[in-house]
Amino acid sequence: MVSRVIYRPFEKDDFSALASILKDTWHTYVPNQEYNALEAACDLVHSLEISSFSQVVLVDDVPCGIVLARAEGDRLPHAKECHAAMDAFLERMHKLEPKATDEYLSFLEAEQRVNSRLLEQSGLARASQITLLAVSGTARGLGIGSVLLDAATSYVASRGAEGLYLYTDTDCSWKFYERRGLKRAAMYRANREERHVLPREMYLYGMDLSA
């Protein structure tokens, strides 16, 4: 049976399904599934906060993937609303699992520190950013990730971007980006002390859009 596939901008009703994709992909370390769901929701709302472009794929009316991006100089229309939502999620997380929440906040702080270093090393500080790309495990292998990435690339190019970048790491499918023409522009290897909060290696991938 042929599935019905639709691409369109993010809508609020997509949030729960997309957060569930993030949970199943990256937020599985705590036995408390309610906490894991909140942590994934926190990640999604943060990505929405720093983005100005969205594209969601629906397969048979079910959200199965999302790409978010920000072109250099874009306004961030949802920043205030998303920041408040993130604070609310963090409060609920802390009530459920205070230790896990503290570890999550330590991860965010360390991740931001490393990402800033990667961006400085890459020379792409004025490029546009792909802030999130996630596809449900049930929809992988169908070319959906490539379509979503192309949509974000086309958007930032239409805004005059001469380059784009994204962050990824050894917990993600970084080889996908190499197959799509992005090149590794910077790398960071976590030291022994950092490995309890950070992935083994973290990368910045970039693409030249000036041609």
Locate each region found by the language model:
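A short beta-loop-alpha structural element at the N-terminal edge
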Residues: 4-20, 71-72
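Helix-loop element at the rim of GNAT/NAT acetyltransferase active sites that forms part
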Residues: 20-36, 73-76
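Active-site rim helix/loop that mediates acceptor-substrate recognition in acyltransferases
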Residues: 33-59, 64, 68, 89-92, ...
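Conserved acyl-donor/pantetheine-binding loop and adjacent beta-alpha core of acyl/acetyltransferases
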Residues: 73-128, 192-197
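Conserved acetyl-CoA-binding loop-helix of GNAT-fold acetyltransferases
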Residues: 135, 141-154, 179
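Conserved active-site alpha-helix within GNAT-family acetyltransferase domains
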Residues: 146, 170-187
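Conserved catalytic-core motifs of GNAT/GCN5-like acyltransferases
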Residues: 165, 183-201
